Regions:
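Active-site cofactor/substrate anionic-group-binding motifs, chiefly glycine-
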Residues: 34-46, 59
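Catalytic phosphate/nucleotide-handling subdomain of diverse soluble enzymes
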Residues: 48, 59-63, 72-76
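Thiamine diphosphate
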Residues: 6-11, 15, 20-29, 43-45, ...
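Conserved glycine-bearing catalytic or ligand-binding loops at nucleotide- and phosphate-handling centers
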Residues: 122-140
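Conserved G/P- and acidic residue-centered "switch" motifs that form tight phosphate/ATP-binding loops
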Residues: 56
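Short, glycine-rich nucleotide/cofactor-binding loops
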Residues: 41, 63-66
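Flexible inter-domain linker/hinge segments
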Residues: 1-5
């Protein structure tokens, strides 16, 4: 992120009082005038970003997944409807462990993928996240881009080139596993296992890939009613796909505090980690 800010002086990062807990302190010291804490007001933050983008600037918004829902109206009316190029760094996507039910980021994927013109990315590790940041900086946008990443530490390393998807394993058979985000890195691999770095819109050949398999398993740190699982089911219906779609998801519940891996095991992923 520091390299991006150094090479692009017109990029500003806004955050509604969430920099402190997210490792941005060194960047705030180096780029004090370009990392703007807008206070605890998510809707105001997003509308401010819309104004900066409308004036020709390049705003990025850093915000926790669980608090992004407070700005849903502004995302639709002030950014998506206006086709403004705003990058959202959606921090703490998925289960966050000890922060508990107020901070689990399990709702945003369901509503983000229903916004016209939105693009949604979910990296499987820190290297892919770095590549996404570089791609977001270089790519011309005509709507919001959401990069969803978990509360976690990474060992660093070189960024990987951005690709919409990656085959983690491909060995024949009639079953396809589709996963996204950090789950792709954490879980056991299926005999045919596709990681979707770009959750939405689906890449061009995804329909053809689905048609090659009789049973589709979708893995997601969400309720599975919308989001990736819902979109896969809808696409299969459009294709008149005769196979089954089996979702591996979280329950519709406010999940308690606890270590992230423990919570995943207790809420639907016990045999997959």
């Amino acid at each position: 992120m520091g390299a991006i800010l150094e090479s692009h002086s017109n990029i500003q990062i806004l955050s509604p009082a969430m920099f402190a807990g997210s490792g941005f302190a060194p960047l705030r010291e180096r780029f004090a005038n370009r990392l703007i804490d807008t206070g605890i007001n998510e809707a105001h933050t997003v509308t401010t970003a819309a104004g900066i983008a409308a004036a020709g600037g390049r705003p990025w918004v850093h915000i926790y997944s669980t608090f992004l829902q407070r700005a849903f109206d502004q995302i639709i009316h002030d950014i998506a409807l206006q086709q403004l190029p705003v990058v959202f760094l959606v921090d703490r996507a998925g289960l966050v462990g000890s922060d508990g039910p107020t901070h689990h980021g399990v709702f945003d994927s369901d509503f983000l993928m229903n916004i016209p013109g939105a693009t949604v990315w979910s990296p499987q590790n820190g290297n892919e996240l770095q590549g996404m940041l570089l791609e977001a900086e270089a790519r011309p946008l005509d709507g919001p881009l959401f990069i969803r990443y978990p509360k976690a530490r990474t060992q660093g390393g070189a960024p990987t080139d951005f690709h919409t998807h990656e085959w983690l394993q491909k060995s024949g058979g009639s079953s396809l596993w589709v996963s996204t985000g950090a789950l792709s890195d954490l879980m056991k691999k299926g005999e045919n296992h596709l990681h979707l770095a770009q959750n939405w819109p689906f890449f061009d050949d995804f329909s053809a890939i689905l048609s090659d398999f009789e049973e589709i398993h979708v893995f997601e740190e969400s309720t599975g009613l919308g989001g990736l699982a819902g979109a896969v089911k809808a696409l299969m219906a459009e294709l008149d796909h005769s196979g089954k779609c089996i979702t591996h998801k979280l329950p519709i519940a406010f999940i308690e505090h606890g270590p992230r891996l423990q919570l995943l095991r207790e809420h639907g992923f016990n045999n997959l980690l």
